[in-house]
């Protein structure tokens, strides 16, 4: 398309030496590409790009390429014929015409409709949707205004006064107002202002400071005075012991319920008192030996050493009392008779235990030995009847406490 450009000018005269050979440049840098300018545009941004491209292309100067080889020297008075002889042989080269630089102002660019009527009818216009406002935040309006003042617009961004954007903005504002009105209607009470919150906060701080001050005053009153000659310790090291008045301990009585046969006995008892007191009380109440008293809680036999606290007894709990039958040892003991033997003198009295099946001769011999009257002839009488010593207490119907008289 383009050929290398010829010489740009002659060298200065005055020296007889020949011209210096210049370095040959590559044809790619020495050629100019044809730049087509689209005069039909619907935005000013494309015009600016074309202008900048043209300016960048003009800054690159194309250096002429000269054929290698020495060039004949020329005198100051050389003529046209001499200059023609000095040129190298070969076909003459046509100089490339330099194109005129075309600079278009944004205001001078003609506005030509790009689309025909059919194309406009088939275009899908931007819908009036509020979701598009997210793609066009409010901060971009300032950028659009700045671009409008400088005459540049972002590619693909709508114009500042586009009707669809203003319509979306107005719709968004209306919906926000509606939601705010609904929120105010739904809320029974408006939220407290930050001023009221700060007042509440200051009141709470004042109350806390008053409480702390009172506690410090109380601590200063209760803390003992430090002894003289000793350094006062820090507040953190102080230990205050407050001893209250010693009150006499009042034992708490626990009403224990005891069921025996058809009777229900209520016995006040301390929680730490053993159940032996219950056994003694029931033995006295029933007129039997304490060894024959058995306490049961449900089906569990209770030990006399246990306490209501260890057994975890409550007010509604009832203890059963059972009277056991007499044991064989008790039967034998009951068969023993306590008989009194009385002599002439008051001091000659002796109490002797004798079995019902034992003869009375044993009692007589025991009395003679105890009183030192062995060898003497003594007579023993029971209810006016003289005893020979071969009788049995059971045959005579004797009981414990009966009296036998001695004469001699």
UniProtKB/Swiss-Prot annotation:
Modified residues annotated as Phosphoserine in this record: 41, 43, 73, 77, 79, 81, 116, 187, 190, 193, 209, 303, 358, 379
PROSITE patterns (alphabetical): UBIQUITIN_2
Compositionally biased spans, kind Low complexity: 24-40
Chief subcellular location: nucleus
Pfam families, per the entry: Rad60-SLD (PF11976)
Sequence position, cross-link Glycyl lysine isopeptide (Lys-Gly) (interchain with G-Cter in SUMO2): 118, 120
Basic and acidic residues: bias regions: 169-181
Coiled coil: 197-220
UniProt-listed Gene3D superfamilies: Phosphatidylinositol 3-kinase Catalytic Subunit, Chain A, domain 1 (3.10.20.90)
One of the GO BP terms on file: protein sumoylation
Subcellular location: Nucleus; Cytoplasm
PTM description: Methylation at the N-terminus by PRMT1 modulates interaction with the NFAT complex and results in augmented cytokine production.
Alphabetical list of CDD domains matching this protein: Ubl_SLD1_NFATC2ip (cd17078), Ubl_SLD2_NFATC2ip (cd17079)
Sequence ranges assigned to domain Ubiquitin-like in this UniProt record: 337-408
GO cellular component terms attached to this protein's record: cytoplasm; nucleus
Basic residues: compositionally biased ranges: 196-205
Region span, Disordered: 1-113, 141-205
InterPro entries, alphabetized: NFATC2-Int_DNA_Repair, Rad60/SUMO-like_dom, Ubiquitin-like_dom, Ubiquitin-like_domsf
Cell inner membrane keyword on record: no
Function of the molecule: In T-helper 2 (Th2) cells, regulates the magnitude of NFAT-driven transcription of a specific subset of cytokine genes, including IL3, IL4, IL5 and IL13, but not IL2. Recruits PRMT1 to the IL4 promoter; this leads to enhancement of histone H4 'Arg-3'-methylation and facilitates subsequent histone acetylation at the IL4 locus, thus promotes robust cytokine expression. Down-regulates formation of poly-SUMO chains by UBE2I/UBC9.
Assembly, per entry: Interacts with NFATC2, TRAF1, TRAF2 and PRMT1. Interacts with UBE2I/UBC9.
Protein name (record): NFATC2-interacting protein
Species annotation: Macaca fascicularis
Name of the encoding gene: NFATC2IP
């Amino acid at each position: 398309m383009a050929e290398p450009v010829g010489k740009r000018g002659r060298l200065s005269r005055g020296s007889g030496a020949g011209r210096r050979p210049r370095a040959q440049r590559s044809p790619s840098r020495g050629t100019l590409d044809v730049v087509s300018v689209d005069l039909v545009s619907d935005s000013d941004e494309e015009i600016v790009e074309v202008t900048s491209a043209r300016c960048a292309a003009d800054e690159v100067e194309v250096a002429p390429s000269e054929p290698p080889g020495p060039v004949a020297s020329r005198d100051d008075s050389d003529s046209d014929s001499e200059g023609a002889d000095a040129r190298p042989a070969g076909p003459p080269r046509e100089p490339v015409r330099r194109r005129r630089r075309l600079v278009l102002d944004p205001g001078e660019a003609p506005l030509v409709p790009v689309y025909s009527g059919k194309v406009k009818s088939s275009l899908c216009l931007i819908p009036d949707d509020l979701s598009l406002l997210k793609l066009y935040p409010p901060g971009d309006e300032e950028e659009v205004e700045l671009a409008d003042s400088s005459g540049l617009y972002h590619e693909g961004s709508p114009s500042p006064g586009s009707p669809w954007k203003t319509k979306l903005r107005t719709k968004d504002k209306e919906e926000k107002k509606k939601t705010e009105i609904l929120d105010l209607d739904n809320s029974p009470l408006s939220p407290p202002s930050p001023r009221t919150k700060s007042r509440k906060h200051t009141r709470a701080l004042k109350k806390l400071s008053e409480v702390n001050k009172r506690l410090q005053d109380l601590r200063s009153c209760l803390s003992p005075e430090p002894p003289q000659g000793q350094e006062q310790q820090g507040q953190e090291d102080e230990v205050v012991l407050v001893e209250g008045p010693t009150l006499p301990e009042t034992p708490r009585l626990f009403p224990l319920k005891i069921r025996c046969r058809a009777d229900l006995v209520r016995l006040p008892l301390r929680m730490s008192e053993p159940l032996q007191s219950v056994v003694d009380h029931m033995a006295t109440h029933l007129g039997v030996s304490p060894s024959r008293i058995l306490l049961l809680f449900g089906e569990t036999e209770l030990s006399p050493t246990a306490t209501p606290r260890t057994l975890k007894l409550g007010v509604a709990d009832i203890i059963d009392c059972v009277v056991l039958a007499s044991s064989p040892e008790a039967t034998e003991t009951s068969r023993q008779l306590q008989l009194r033997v009385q002599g002439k003198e008051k001091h000659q009295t002796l109490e002797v235990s004798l079995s019902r099946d034992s003869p009375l001769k044993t009692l007589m011999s025991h009395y003679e030995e105890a009183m030192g009257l062995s060898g003497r002839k003594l007579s023993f009488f029971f209810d006016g009847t003289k005893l020979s010593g071969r009788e049995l207490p059971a045959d005579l119907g004797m009981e414990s406490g009966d009296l036998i008289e001695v004469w001699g």
